[in-house]
Amino acid sequence: GFLPFVKKTCSYQKSKIKGIFADKSYLSYWTNDFDFGNAKPKSPVTSVSWFAAKKYCECQGKRLATMDEWEYVAMADTKKIDARTKKEFNEYILSWYEKSRTYENEIGKTFKNYWGVYDMHGLVWEWTYDFNSIFLSGESRKDKSTDKNLFCGSGSVNASDLMDYAA
């Protein structure tokens, strides 16, 4: 878990993390370096910087998934590798955005997908290794190579094809 990681890795404790690696919201609901306050022990850890998530994975001998890897695994339901054409699958994913405080739910309680992975949808947004590989700025608006169909969160409301959004 994340608590043993911060106990072992002092530089990622709430009171010791450098501003370059996290903003002031880092572990904001924790009452101190080792107490996660009112959060449930089996709920996902939130308010974690990309640097902390990356370091946590490295300490486990793992790495963050790339955006492509995450999306590939996320498009699977319990029986199909690619369930994006299934109406009920898309409705389930999109209904998650209507729910509040999903970060309080217990991990491992959403469906286990085709790959044996739980909680791909229904808890929290997750960091990916290359989350910043698409950078849009005022200067990139005329860039022909940038995918103009990238959007997140409520940006899906007016999407022409919600299937592109759900996974």
Residue map of PLM features:
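Intrinsic disorder/low-complexity segments enriched in polar/small residues
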Residues: K8, K14, G19, E88-Y92
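Functional-site microenvironments in short loops/helix caps that host divalent-cation chemistry
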Residues: L27-A166
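Compositionally biased, intrinsically disordered low-complexity segments
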Residues: T9, I20, I134-G138
